[in-house]
């Protein structure tokens, strides 16, 4: 049967229904704030007789069944109900609708009041109490305090009985200083109090740490967490300045704090209020907390119980994640720890409820206080006194890959940082001449690859290490010793001490981050997704913390491994490895601006202050070498059309022979049966597409902005895509040029379909058929730019791009009457270009500001070329998204469009509807896009999100009827990343609930989801599983890494050659990813079910949301996309189709096969001299990039077979045979050159590549020895 009406569900449902068990009463008071409930209960307890009262937390009434039960047993018997929903109606709509309906039916009164001190018109429809009465009731809460709690009860009773109404609310200070035992006091009283509690030291004024918390805690007397923080700070010799506010958006509160801070300026602020003053994506509103330049630490008074926190790998519930983590990041706060938890202290029989209070946890309080004190100490110290450690990542763990940092010339950036520090007065010593000199110096000492026969500059003795190790929690010690044995067994333990990869430059030390441990035993990748780090890793950070005495640590560039160590996702405990190893140290982390997810991981698990930096410069691929020759031949062929047929045949044969010779036929999609004309048409379109691809042109150097052509090309890349509403100066520059040049028709946009009215179509250079013959106008301003033929729409696009670059650089003047283009150029000159040019200085300013213990301004994150110029200038402490708003309506539109194109492509390729896809969802990508991946998954199964249109938050889902869908539903298995699991628990629940709801009574052919769930449930029941559990397990469609672990397992196996066959790679992927997630499921081991899902998938789907990188830039793509393919092939007996989709332009998603995408990237970027020349500007790190690219090619070949012989051949010719490039690598990074040759040799030995030259293997085998000899000679 078909579902004719849309069905709906919510994601706000509680995990389970709760029966509060309350008997009826005259008055019910429901609130989301436990402090209010406590205050009202206390006021009621002071009374004898009178009306009966029941109180309840709204958080206990999130599940619809809980609401129904409460209304039936308790609420419908009341005479008055007062509700205070925090956050508006959207979170509690089901409850409010049910209560209002009951009030109308049973004729009692209901007053729904705002949960804070801001009016909320959206609540008015749920009330029956008159507006003036609601205002009076609300005032008792906005003023607060025990007296007003009593007056509220009096007023509520008056509404029920008709008695005289009491006096209005008594005013209570909105903000002020509060002190234990003294109450609300002034600045002078505070100064006297703290002076008497501090041990006097001549000439020393102790630091001041502000503690900002909600006024509601003073009102209710729930101040124990504040008192605990005061005690912990004082124990460290620091003055605590506890200040309360009604809200950081309240003008009176802000003014009061400004006055207090003007007399008693804090060095650091610890903030316990939730939410943010600014809104994500809006202009920043500075807060009073950082007005003195103080860094602001976010401490959390959690809404969860201590038991929930201790047992949860997530650490915090979704509501805490949004209110106390994600939104405070928008204001630039540094996440410290959850320092208190909710505890039911007593059961109050009069109100039939547990009175819940805040219970501080000593260890968490102490850690947060230590972090605050350490920030204060950094701020108080003079630059010359500060001891700073700078750590560079190193993976793979080889000498050719030191200083890993995505998109970053990490060594050169580190030298820039050292130089800037020296100018600021830091005791830096002699700064290396450049990045290559720094690397040579570090490589003379121990590295992850080798320690023997190296200069050991820094070491930590066994006794000193044992002192550190013994101070760790027992669980940590047991796990490390259990896995790695005694410290002396560590491979970096030499002659009684650990040899450390560190080098001092005055009071600054630069080091190479140790390996996680997989390099010691690569096969451990199979079995240990949560592998604990070895002794050598702990020894490195022990030395920095204790022997060196680092006051702050810098991790240079995306990304290291510290933030990915085992432990909770949020609100870490002492047994979480990032905390145990790193401790409460100030942490500065330069990080690429377009990767909010992985940077956010560092913010949330290591309290990092991000200093975001630019992407690498971007440019057009253009044509080169054999591709340019082909292009000229194709132009010659079409110019000769209509002439001598024999010459045409000769030209076509010459062209197609060359195409086949270099393997371009398969990349261009030329089939064996294609006619010459069809083959040439495909080739022409392909060459045009390659030319216009966006590629990287070198790397970014931290603190240095691009100049000259690099600045021009990056500016053009940012201006290519419309920004904002795409109007005026925010239009696409290329579209503006096309419009002003009068280019119309002659190339139908691919998204428009076959519209014959060509002349009526405005020409769109971003969406056209490149190989279409151009018969339109050829204005001289475009024609004069190039002597190349102007034959196709692609030639038109090329000229538009050339003109755009000339206009942006100022080499050509824009015609006065080109209004559209002039508007865009005005925006470029006033905003876009300056934001790029200012980024270098802003990055260094942000870095030095953070290093001086001062507040670093926050800013948004994302891909600048995806219409996000607001992320520039860089140099800010970026934030991500409000996870409650994911997926956004715009993301759903893109996801839906991409889903339909994907299904259409599969139908075209295979001749039948798809039934099952496997899709990867990454936290970073979904932060950048607002949820494209999860939106696409929902669209594929035939569901869509529902939103509260006021707050724009996702409230639930709606099942799309088959009649509307117009196709069968596609069963989707999600393999989520560890960070997606941590950051998007609500989205996991959304998809989980939606796919279960989709299991409708529809025909199997139309709904394989339902068919498979029914069949699997029956199978599980036959095996003895209870029906409910069988149904639940059969519904699992979201899988990820083990709780507390991250990744997909393949990197270490590939890097360390720890595999024999593809089955080994499949096994690792399955072992690491076989944990089921969903509503109420936090990672249940379900290997058999994960295998069953992958066995039946027909296609692997991977989306790429920007072109600032490609799939051969990172190990993530091959690990997830390739890993899923390898596992599915191993289980199902054949390799599924693999689609790698381009979402870089949201209005025009493009579906490509993995083979197509790899071919494009190899041709346009990997072997393109323009890219090679760009990385060669960066010496050692440039050679690193070349070797890394070949690694990723190899890994895709190993996992998917999608890399062809001619791709390897092209790389071999470009990097080995080309003497210019080979000499560069031998000179700048001989280790990387040897690693590259070794990887190509491995490709031959594993039958992944058959070279054309018989001598290739011999040549490659000799390079490693020669490179080693050369390096030894240089040393």
Swiss-Prot record:
Q: Which UniProt keywords apply?
A: ATP-binding, Cobalamin biosynthesis, Cytoplasm, Ligase, Nucleotide-binding, Porphyrin biosynthesis
Which EC class is this protein assigned?
ligase
Q: What is its main location?
A: cytoplasm
Query: Which top-level group of life is the source organism from?
Result: Bacteria
The UniProt catalytic activity note for this protein reads: hydrogenobyrinate a,c-diamide + Co(2+) + ATP + H2O = cob(II)yrinate a,c diamide + ADP + phosphate + 5 H(+)
Query: For this protein, what is any one GO molecular function term?
Result: cobaltochelatase activity
Of the GO CC terms on this record, one is: cytoplasm
Give the UniProt subcellular location, in the record's own words: Cytoplasm
EC number, UniProt record = 6.6.1.2
* Pathway noted in the entry: Cofactor biosynthesis; adenosylcobalamin biosynthesis; cob(II)yrinate a,c-diamide from precorrin-2 (aerobic route): step 10/10
List the Pfam families hit by this protein, alphabetically. Answer: CobN-Mg_chel
State whether keyword Ion transport applies: no
The UniProt entry's GO biological process terms, in alphabetical order, are: cobalamin biosynthetic process; porphyrin-containing compound biosynthetic process
The record's annotation in PANTHER family points to: AEROBIC COBALTOCHELATASE SUBUNIT COBN (PTHR44119:SF4), MAGNESIUM-CHELATASE SUBUNIT CHLH, CHLOROPLASTIC (PTHR44119)
Q: How does it assemble?
A: Heterotrimer of CobN, CobS and CobT.
The similarity annotation says: Belongs to the CobN family.
Per its record, how is this protein called by name? Aerobic cobaltochelatase subunit CobN
**Organism listed in the record:** Sinorhizobium sp
* Gene encoding the protein: cobN
């Amino acid at each position: 049967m078909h579902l004719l009406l849309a069905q709906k569900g919510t994601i706000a449902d509680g995990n389970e229904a709760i029966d509060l068990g309350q008997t009826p009463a005259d008055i019910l008071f429901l609130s989301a704030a436990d402090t209010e409930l406590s205050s009202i209960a206390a006021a009621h307890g002071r009374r004898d007789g009178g009306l009966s009262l029941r109180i309840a937390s709204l958080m206990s009434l999130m599940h619809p069944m809980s609401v129904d039960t409460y209304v039936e047993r308790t609420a419908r018997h009341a005479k008055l109900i007062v509700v205070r929903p925090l956050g508006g109606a959207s979170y509690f709509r089901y409850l409010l609708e049910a209560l209002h309906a009951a009030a109308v039916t049973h004729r009692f009164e209901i007053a729904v009041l705002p949960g804070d001190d801001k009016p909320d018109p959206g609540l008015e429809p749920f009330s029956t109490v008159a507006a003036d009465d609601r205002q009076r009731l609300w005032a008792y809460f906005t003023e607060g305090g025990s007296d007003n709690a009593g007056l509220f009860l009096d007023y509520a009773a008056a509404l029920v009985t008709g008695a005289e109404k009491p006096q209005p609310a008594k005013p209570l200070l909105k903000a002020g200083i509060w002190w234990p035992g003294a109450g609300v006091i002034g600045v002078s009283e505070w100064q006297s109090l703290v002076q008497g509690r501090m041990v006097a030291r001549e000439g020393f004024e102790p630091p001041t740490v502000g503690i900002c918390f909600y006024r509601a805690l003073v009102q209710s007397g729930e101040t124990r967490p504040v008192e605990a923080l005061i005690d912990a700070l004082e124990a460290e010799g620091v003055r605590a300045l506890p200040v309360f506010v009604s809200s950081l958006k309240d003008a009176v509160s802000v003014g009061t704090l400004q006055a207090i801070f003007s007399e008693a300026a804090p060095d650091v602020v610890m903030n316990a209020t939730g939410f943010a003053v600014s809104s994500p994506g809006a202009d920043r509103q500075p807060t009073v907390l950082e007005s003195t330049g103080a860094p602001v630490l976010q401490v959390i008074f959690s809404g969860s119980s201590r038991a929930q926190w201790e047992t949860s790998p997530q650490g915090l519930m979704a509501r805490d994640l949004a209110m106390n983590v994600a939104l405070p990041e928008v204001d630039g706060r540094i996440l410290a720890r959850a320092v208190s938890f909710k505890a039911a202290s007593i059961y109050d029989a009069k109100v039939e409820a547990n009175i819940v209070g805040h219970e501080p946890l000593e260890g968490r309080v102490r850690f947060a206080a230590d972090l605050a004190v350490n920030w204060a100490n950094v701020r108080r110290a003079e630059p010359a006194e500060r001891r700073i450690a700078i750590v560079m990542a190193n993976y793979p763990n080889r000498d050719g890959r030191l200083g890993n940092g995505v998109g970053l010339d990490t060594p050169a950036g580190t030298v820039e940082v050292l130089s800037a520090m020296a100018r600021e007065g830091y005791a830096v010593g002699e700064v290396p001449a450049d990045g290559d000199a720094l690397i040579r110096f570090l490589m003379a000492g121990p590295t992850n690859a080798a320690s023997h026969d190296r200069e050991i500059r820094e070491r930590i003795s066994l006794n000193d290490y044992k002192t550190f190790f013994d101070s760790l929690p027992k669980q940590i010690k047991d796990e490390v010793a259990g896995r790695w044995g005694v410290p002396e067994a560590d491979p970096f333990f030499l002659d009684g001490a650990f040899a450390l990869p560190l080098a001092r430059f005055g009071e600054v030390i630069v080091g190479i981050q140790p390996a996680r441990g997989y390099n010691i035993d690569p096969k451990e990748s199979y079995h240990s997704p949560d592998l604990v780090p070895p002794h050598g890793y702990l020894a490195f950070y022990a030395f920095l913390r204790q022997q060196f005495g680092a006051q702050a640590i810098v991790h240079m560039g995306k990304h290291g491994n510290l933030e990915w160590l085992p432990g909770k996702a949020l609100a870490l405990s002492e047994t979480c490895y990032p905390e145990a190893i790193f401790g409460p140290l100030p942490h500065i982390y330069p990080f690429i601006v377009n990767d909010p997810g992985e940077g956010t991981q560092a913010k949330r698990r290591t309290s990092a202050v991000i200093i975001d930096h630019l992407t690498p410069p971007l440019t057009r691929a253009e044509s080169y070498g054999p591709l340019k020759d082909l292009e000229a031949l194709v132009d010659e062929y079409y110019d000769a059309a209509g002439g001598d047929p024999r010459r045409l045949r000769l030209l076509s044969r010459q062209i197609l022979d060359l195409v086949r010779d270099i393997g371009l036929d398969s990349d261009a999609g030329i089939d064996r049966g294609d006619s010459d004309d069809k083959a040439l048409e495909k080739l022409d379109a392909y060459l045009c597409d390659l030319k216009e691809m966006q590629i990287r042109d070198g790397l970014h150097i931290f603190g240095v902005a691009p100049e000259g052509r690099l600045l021009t090309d990056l500016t053009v890349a940012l201006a290519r895509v419309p920004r904002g509403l795409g109007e005026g100066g925010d239009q696409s520059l290329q579209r503006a040029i096309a419009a002003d040049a009068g280019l119309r028709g002659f190339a139908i946009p691919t998204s428009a379909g076959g519209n014959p009215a060509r002349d009526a179509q405005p020409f769109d250079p971003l969406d056209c058929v490149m190989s279409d013959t151009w018969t339109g106008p050829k204005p001289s301003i475009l024609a004069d730019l190039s002597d190349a033929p102007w034959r196709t729409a692609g030639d038109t696009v090329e000229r538009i791009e050339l003109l755009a670059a000339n206009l942006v650089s100022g080499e050509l003047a824009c015609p006065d009457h080109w209004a559209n283009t002039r508007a865009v150029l005005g925006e470029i000159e006033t905003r876009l270009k300056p934001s790029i040019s200012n980024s270098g200085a802003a990055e260094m300013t942000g870095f030095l500001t953070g290093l001086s213990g001062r507040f670093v301004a926050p800013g948004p994150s994302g891909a600048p070329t995806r219409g996000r110029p607001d992320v520039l200038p860089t140099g800010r402490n970026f934030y991500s998204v409000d996870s409650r708003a994911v997926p956004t309506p715009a993301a759903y539109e893109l996801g839906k469009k991409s889903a339909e194109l994907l299904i259409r492509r599969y139908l075209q390729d295979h001749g039948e509807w798809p039934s099952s896809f496997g899709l990867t969802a990454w936290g970073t990508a979904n932060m950048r896009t607002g949820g494209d991946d999860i939106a696409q998954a929902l669209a594929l199964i035939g569901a869509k999100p529902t939103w509260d249109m006021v707050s724009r938050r996702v409230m639930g889902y709606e099942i799309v009827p088959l009649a509307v869908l117009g196709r069968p539903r596609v069963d989707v298995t999600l393999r989520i990343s560890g960070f997606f699991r941590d950051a998007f628990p609500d989205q996991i629940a959304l998809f989980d609930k939606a796919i279960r709801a989709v299991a409708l009574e529809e025909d199997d052919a139309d709904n394989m989801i339902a068919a498979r769930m029914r069949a699997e449930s029956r199978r599980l029941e036959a095996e003895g599983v209870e029906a409910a559990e069988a149904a639940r397990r059969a519904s699992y469609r979201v899988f990820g890494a083990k709780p507390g672990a991250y990744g997909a397992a393949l990197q270490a196996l590939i890097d360390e050659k720890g595999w024999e066959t593809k089955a080994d790679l499949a096994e690792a992927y399955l072992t690491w990813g076989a944990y089921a997630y969903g509503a109420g499921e936090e990672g249940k081991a379900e290997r058999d079910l994960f295998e069953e899902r992958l066995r039946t998938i027909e296609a692997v789907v991977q989306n790429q949301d920007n072109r600032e990188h490609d799939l051969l830039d990172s190990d993530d793509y091959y690990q997830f996309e390739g890993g899923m393919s390898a596992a599915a092939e191993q289980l199902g007996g054949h390799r599924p189709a693999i689609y790698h989709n381009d979402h870089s332009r949201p209005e025009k998603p493009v579906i490509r096969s993995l083979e197509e995408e790899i071919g494009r990237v190899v041709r346009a970027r990997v072997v393109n001299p323009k890219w090679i020349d760009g990385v060669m500007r960066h010496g050692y790190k440039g050679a690193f990039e070349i070797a890394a690219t070949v690694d990723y090619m190899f890994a895709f070949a190993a996992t998917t077979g999608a890399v062809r012989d001619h791709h390897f051949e092209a790389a071999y010719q470009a990097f080995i045979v080309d003497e210019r490039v080979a000499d560069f690598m031998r000179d700048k990074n001989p280790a990387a050159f040897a690693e590259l040759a070794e990887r190509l040799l491995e490709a031959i030995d594993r039958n992944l590549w058959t070279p054309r030259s018989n001598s290739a293997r011999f040549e490659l085998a000799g390079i490693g020895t020669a490179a080693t000899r050369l390096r030894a000679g240089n040393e």
